[in-house]
UniProtKB/Swiss-Prot annotation:
It catalyses: Hydrolysis of (1->4)-beta-D-galactosidic linkages in agarose, giving the tetramer as the predominant product. Disruption phenotype: Disruption of the gene results in loss of agarase activity. InterPro entries: Glycoside_hydrolase_SF (IPR017853), Porphyrn_b-sand_dom_1 (IPR040527). This is Beta-agarase. Belongs to the glycosyl hydrolase 86 family. Residues 1-23 form the signal peptide. It comes from Pseudoalteromonas atlantica (Alteromonas atlantica). One of its GO terms (cellular component) is extracellular region. CDD domains: agarase_cat. GO terms for molecular function: beta-agarase activity. It comes from the Bacteria. The keyword Secreted applies. The lineage of its organism: Bacteria, Pseudomonadati, Pseudomonadota, Gammaproteobacteria, Alteromonadales.
Amino acid sequence: MLKVIPWLLVTSSLVAIPTYIHATTEVVVNLNVKHSVEGKSEFERKNHIKLHSTLNDNDWQGEEDKLKYMMEELDVYFGRDNGGTVWNFNQAIEDPANIGYADPQNIIARGQAQRETNWGQNKSALHQYDGRGDLMIGGQPRAHYLGNTSPCCGGSAWQAKGGDAVGDFLGQYVNEFFRSAGDPVTKGHLAPVYFEVLNEPLYQVTDAPHELGLEQPIPPIDIFTFHNDVADAFRQHNTHIKIGGFTVAFPIFEQREFARWEERMKLFIDTSGSHMDVYSTHFYDLEDDNRFKGSRLEATLDMIDQYSLLALGETKPHVISEYGGRNRPMENAPWSALRDWWFLKTASPMLMQFLSRPDSVLTSIPFVPIKALWGTAADGTPYNWRLLRQQKEAPNETGENWVFTEMVKFYQLWSDVKGTRVDTFSTNSDFLIDSYVQNDKAYVLISNLTEQAEKIVVHKYGAPASSQPTTRIKHLYLKGAAPRLMKQVMRQISKKSRLLLKRLW
């Protein structure tokens, strides 16, 4: 039996209310009944409480105190890097003996310099955080699909010879720019675990080809056969990294009576499913009715699983390499706390849904880069999604120093959660409920998916009869025009607790 005394309620819409208020929904937490899915029952923080960044990210320079806070106090992990593959592909030299392909000797030399000098010596202060999370890397349509290199410093550009040449480079890149298993940390950054062939390719080359200077859209089938060529060439050099695609930007499968499904995800599974180790998808709630959290997200993953089983005879795991919330009318404006809230109010419910599939969702990464200077607009407007902003960006603040945006509250909300998953259920299907037990502590997670406040009763069973636990509540909600993370302590809480879940909208 699990011994449970203290417990923590974590949600983005939870407050305590007096016990005389009648509740419309009941939630049950069985603290001594383990909940296992295909043998998976542990909360894997390193796979889900992640930043869209790596230790190699130059944004950490000068912000070592913030890196330490994220790693040591909030227990956050890495991460995803789609920039290193672009920069190093652009600097690669063409092989004079094999036109259209990168020179292997140049890859080896530059990789050694990156591993042993840039990482091993220049970034030795970061080695203490080595191995925090499974790294994901990937290609980009402009650099890798178009394949025309753009070197700095007077280098000569050359045209890659299709997916085979790109996969050949990327397979060697992983082998040479990262250390081998068993090597000391001074020999390079830990090698990635996942490789996405292209990031959101159909958005960039099919839906908005003008953004890449293309006159006509590229049909999806061309992108999918490119995936196959890259994967096959990559595996000539490396077979232990999981390859994924097609990194769907907007999985709106039901559009035009599911014609979009037929033309895209179904076609991808038919064409490239056998070449992939994982399926890669992005999920974002928008400011209108185009939202995924809740049943739509479940249906989207179910459709992929079911058709994969029908077409290939097997399902494949998922990697969710970006997720969160957006308010597009606010995206061309300066930073605001309210815009960050649109991200925050979606992130936790989506994470809870990913956690409910521990056997199939291998990792999920909220889209939170660090400074994201690479995304600054031509008019100087900073990138929307960032962990850090400059002081001068907020009203009534001045200064050039970098401080946390409101997005840090996602990590503060989840900072304590860990342990073994236990049984929970609710009488209301519009509530997400989950719970984990670690030693003598229980962590209870509740999220309200409805558009109105909901009263609930939480019943907990399985704690020792003599225990008089202390309950800490973390409550992330919108107050005025800014997110607020409230922390509250309740002592000697009864086995039946009456609460109010506010609406998220």
